[in-house]
């Protein structure tokens, strides 16, 4: 109904994640709850669309080594024990997440913490409402690039405001919990050799 009405609205009326009506805001809240708070399986958010293909191909080759991540069923089909975040037009409209690029992870982090008046702190809202923490982890998987203009460095500096100790923890462990009371993590793959 709202989608149809938005098409009929005059052009000067904006329709995006920051200009939602009451029903749309409730639906935005529901989407966050369903996919990022009460998620049935861990969710992996990647920088690009092709990252998912590479991860799936690698896991299919190594499924015997990682039974906690992937298994082969009786019909020979692979069953993943996690899900990938799928960028859709719905996420673009309700959260402002583009269909490709690392901005999705920055935006999802902002909706976890509530970075300003226009972006609600959904994590604390649902923790207070439900009395429990996130069901399963949400993993922001960044490429391990620490150069100044790369997405990981920008995210840690501009959004997380990571301390020197936090950056050292991420470099040493290849993962870091972003919010103490959450299951939101940033993860990077290991570097090969002396590569940066």
Feature map (PLM): residue ranges:
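Acidic, divalent-metal-binding catalytic cores of TOPRIM
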Residues: 1-196
